């Protein structure tokens, strides 16, 4: 019956059914085997074998497309797509993907080749006081990009590749374990106008030039497009930076053992011989060429002038001594950003604010930031003639450009003042046009401008400077690769030896310590912790050297392929909001979109139920497809700290209004979600995971539904995206629209969802192992919270413990004896005392009690067995010790103890390693045993299907079995979680971990669980408990109701239609298309038991029918219905207390009365039938001599009167059968509804556990 949901409401899309276990199975199959399992030949080959069938064996089964559409519809209901976003990204997504592919691979697809430049830098930027960015070896950043320090890239690259290489080198030097964030890194680097921003601006110019690529983005020309693209590029590089951080963080440090570090503390290294000794100790032994004398002279010269020329800052406005020290430290540690000839010495207030807040922009020169009004995006990228980027000084056309191909890092001067222009010479731009790092400018002057910290007139009375420029030059000299007295040339270049920068790292550490402590060289010996700092530098160099060697140096198309999707996703997420589609032309125009503020979707009961009952129980799987976000007054709080997708679990309805469950997509903060697999930009992750449509013709038709086939001609028009298009058209349709066009065909999604909710996909071994691992993690996570748990958790916990114990068990059953075997499978003699390892008393006393308890033949708990409750028990050791001790106990002994205490068993359904369902009996839990003890009902009370069984059924309560005094004592123990109850729980788990105890037909080898013999097909219609693998109860019940309906229709059609005068019922033969439950073999296949047989003619004719009636143990109809009825009662009993459903005694009595009435009618009908058959036999045996057709007319009336009731009896019999069918269908549907309700919503008190999952235990 349909609920109150409107057409197309969330409830219509079966979210829990579609996205539950079958979704996990479907994705496992797709990930592991692509489309192969869903071909008609593999999923249901019978579709193609029928005469005239339109299906082919190589067609894609309709279950695939229908399920894909059902999942897409369910995801659409959880989070509706932004249709405007889809429209915008659809305009440029494909072109953007093509352009970025070309940039990453270096491919030329346009009219002219992409502009390229060599990669390099004179130093990396450094901020000594940055709150989020810390360096492993402060000072190492001073080294320029040269082969003496870094692995080199010997080729020219486009700006995007160079920007990524720049990120690699900068991130390699950072402490990645200090919480550094990729956003902090890019936010800092985008203030670097010497190198990083040049790369960014070149990327923008390249991407928006139509001549370099085969496709155009189609963006409107000019501003604000340039800034939109620039912001998008920066965000894309942020995604790349995140991936680089993760990659380098996982690079293992070198195990290289370096030379003796030397004693530094207390050593006066200001003396030449002492310094030489220190340099020798940190340099690489065995390699000549270290000139300690020259290095000594350099250090002495530099540090001697560090602070003697330092200004008196007392009178400088707004600068105290601490701030002055920061200026000096950062100034001395960034010489290139002060000394480069193109650095602006003064910056006005507006440009400084922009630089300090958001980093450099295109044309970030001080006074020339306007753009030429005639600029064009197509062929004329010129700016104002005074611009940094004006056409005459084009970044790749000017022969004097900083990026020109003639640049070299082997010239004789770091800045190229002599020996030619080098890569780092920003002098190609007009002097004073490039802003330096914002913290290298001093405090604001009266007019709001700021001066470089090495400039005079900083605002004090003496026109003093903050940092002495000569000292900065000496730092630059010391780290200049061309300075003969510098650190780089004076430490011999030893190529690829892992020690090659070791000594340099020590020396720049010494330099850094002198700078930050404002110490001269002769004060070095007094620096605090200098030796520790140098030792740390040596250790940290281990990390740096392996990171540097992990940086790609060639084949960037493949070595950087995993960074491509991060760049794309972040670019799209930033750019699409800034464009709109013009209605008249369909072109993109600039204009920020108004994005609707999506509120919480947890108010929807279906979504909340899916989250609470499905998602959080397998979070590791679902976090690939969903993410949880926090909401604020204006929508999603981007930087909110959502620790885990399960964070909203257990929250109140009011608290849930601050959360929203979203569907993961390829746009957004994808660096936190993983890489894209396939699909297009803006797709949800589910669409990514749909396999590409093969282009080799291996798949013929794709069945969209069971009535609609998509041909290869239609599909090939969309290439590899053909199958993803199905999901895309559904997901991107308006929410609430139940009928949507897919490939131009109208599809009713609510009908598709109903079909998909009944689908079952095969489970692979890998899938089951993953499911169990998720179960394990979920159990441990929930146990650590200490909160109340649901029955579902209790069941999971029991399965977990049973699995852990089952793996370690080496007991095997032989008849009624249990044998312990060693690892080689040989029997081992056991010690009876092993059964007492968990009992904390003398072995003698323990064995005495156990022996007498087991030997006691009584039906009630004896005083001897009750003594067990007085012992102490060792049930809280670490799990590994507990497993060792319990695994030595004979499981038969554990079973006997539990049996003496009145534990029952129940029929359960487990999964084996292949995922098949196995039915086996288990011991009830201690929690259910205590609940039963608190009640008064008898286990086998009349009118109730048995839930637990304990051998012969006894109609007394558990309290009576144990005795009042013992029962009260146990209940008192339950209040304090007594060790005895924990001991019993250990025994329960141990018996259940050895299923052979209660299931003698099982062997240790699980492969033998497949049935060796079925019950004889005509013997019984009862559920066969051990017919494994077993089909799910809902599957059986749905088939039961279906086949009852078929039988009913067959009967109705005959006694109301043309066959109403026939004298035999369909119950005798069973319609040939009727399967379960009328055939026992139907539990694992759909082969019918019998086919219809005519009363006359054919093989054996009516006599064959008579033989079948005899074989079926008349009355066949009653036997069948009676067994179906009992099977339904048994199913009701076995679904457990949490979903308890029972027939009242009055209802059962009325059902049994109807069965008895039906039986009597069948007996009379069979008597008439047999008399008719006998009369026919007489006719045939006498060859017609005795022929009733020749009865004299005067006697015909008497003969007809004698047999006139036969047709009426048959009709009445059929009507009684229909009535019983209606009753059984009603019962079966009631059970189905109860089963599908799942576990109850309320939490329950957790049964006593042994503390297996105490977080302090070491697993």
Swiss-Prot record:
Region described as Disordered: 354-410
Q: Where is the composition biased (Low complexity)?
A: 362-410
Q: Which UniProt keywords apply?
A: Virion
**Principal place of residence:** virion
Where does the UniProt annotation locate this protein?
A: Virion
- Give a GO cellular-component term: virion component
Name by which UniProt lists this protein? Uncharacterized protein L442
Species in which this protein is naturally found: Acanthamoeba polyphaga mimivirus (APMV)
The lineage, from the top, is: Viruses, Varidnaviria, Bamfordvirae, Nucleocytoviricota, Megaviricetes
